[in-house]
Amino acid sequence: MDVHRDFLIACIAATNAQGVTEYQSRRFSTYTGSLRELRDWLLANDCKDVCMESTGKYWFPVHNILEESCHVVVSHPKFVKAIKGKKTDKKDAQWIADLFKHDLVRGSFIPPKDIRQLRDLCRYWVKLSSYMTGEKNRAQNCLTVSNFKLDDVFSNVFGKSASAITTQLLEHPGEQFDVAPFVDGRCKTPIAQIQEAVDGIFTYEQAEKLKIIRGHMDSLERHKAELESLILEIAQNYLPQIELLLTVPGIHDAFTAIRILAEIGADMTVFDTSKHLCSWAGLTPQNAESAGKKKTTRIGKSGAYLKPLLIQVALAASRGEKHPEIYGKKQALQKRRGKKKAIVAIARRLLTAIYHI
């Protein structure tokens, strides 16, 4: 199938006993009713093996309709790209059918529906966290522009004491006040230094901007908490797998385990070996060799969500003396290959352990 935003072209390739292949092509819209017609048309022609390329998000509705009745293979466009020449949507669909018929298409990993839903929510949580980081940076910029040096006297500008002082500054602009009642007793910075740090000037525009930013941050925090509750509720069906993941060094909380589970799924048989899983996650060097020379040995770009998470887990596992075997391996690799490559190697070892667990 050649899938587009508003329509798709489906081509059935049927080979008879004499080895002659006959093609049937039809065009369907991407409305749900038309996709059901596509499903019925495929079943009426006894076609239960379907292949399509992953074009953006447009393949999702098609896959959702067909996955219960057909074996659906979704492939990266580079694996089904037609040779240069005359190009039409109908010819593209026929080309994909021919490749699939001869078992020349490498399918992408599509996890079960419940894992896909969990993955979607976890990735949205990552996006909200990114938005929160951006808003914190903008809030800090407002304070810096107005010459409030809270970041010099507090370790966390968004902690309890600093937030209370910021609220006082916004509610009473231009007024002098004593900061002592707003500072927590555990704060080690002298009150006099804090008092000097809050001697800035808020313009009307910067103050209003900061109010909007703080309101947005509160909204993001609330929605993140709601999303976390939903994710934890859905993940209850995978408690045994989550408990196993928590035994891996560096994974200290259930939410991290859930995020890893949402990316790789619970069934490791879809990957032939642990090396296939590591390659899929983008933790192995690329193969780019020509005329006996390696052009690059950089790791791949895949695993945009899983790879950063595993790097964080590797950093946590290789820090301190809790796991001396991992710490020692990281130190040995770091001397020879550098810190970044050492951490990637540790992340790959941890993912290999996850595969076998």
Segments (PLM) and residue ranges:
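A detector of single, family-specific signature residues
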Residues: 1-357
